[in-house]
């Protein structure tokens, strides 16, 4: 795993992981990921709408983000959902998040995935942390690409605007093409 120190005091910061974490998540119930549980969170990249973590310093009016640029093409099953797990095959999923390292806000990311201090199974369900390991044959390599970006923002809203626009431009989301109608999907999900 890799860590990038922002140099910002952790207590002066707000945090963002698209679709998962906004500010300090203090309005979330205690069963959901929030500062009520921990001030450091690492999650699988597929838990997020974009594989990105951002830290905004309200005092410095600056932010630092890390995002993954690789294609996510595979995942592998495990026999366990907590503790140290060995993957059954290849995965392209890593992790991203933020940590309080001796009072300094730090971006953390790596491969394969880790979730700490808890794993987020589904809405309002936290489980013990997990750390995955993938077998590599001698001489085999895995090339991964993350981008660390730093800039200024007038406030947290400006930081979110900038980051959202960056994610939209970078990942260019498109509607999902499905052979099923909305009515068929609703019928299947409700039965």
Regions found by a protein language model. Name each.
Residues 1-138:
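Beta-strand/loop-rich accessory regions of lumenal/periplasmic or secreted enzymes
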Residues 133-158:
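Short Pro-Gly-centered flexible turn/kink motifs
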């Amino acid at each position: 795993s890799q860590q990038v120190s922002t140099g910002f005091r952790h207590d002066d910061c707000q945090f963002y992981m698209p679709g998962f974490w906004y500010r300090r998540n203090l309005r979330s119930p205690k069963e959901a990921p929030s500062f009520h549980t921990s001030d450091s969170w690492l999650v699988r990249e597929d838990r997020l709408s974009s594989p990105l973590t951002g830290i905004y310093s309200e005092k410095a009016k600056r932010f630092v983000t890390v995002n993954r640029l690789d294609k996510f093409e595979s995942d592998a099953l495990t026999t366990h959902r907590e503790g140290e797990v060995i993957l059954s095959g290849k995965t392209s999923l890593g992790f991203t998040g933020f940590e309080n390292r001796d009072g300094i806000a730090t971006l953390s990311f790596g491969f394969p995935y880790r979730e700490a201090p808890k794993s987020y199974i589904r809405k309002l369900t936290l489980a013990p942390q997990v750390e995955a390991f993938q077998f590599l044959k001698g001489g085999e390599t895995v090339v991964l690409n993350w981008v660390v970006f730093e800039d200024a923002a007038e406030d947290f809203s400006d930081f979110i605007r900038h980051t959202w626009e960056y994610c939209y431009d970078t990942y260019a989301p498109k509607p999902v093409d499905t052979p099923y109608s909305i009515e068929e999907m609703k019928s299947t999900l409700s039965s």
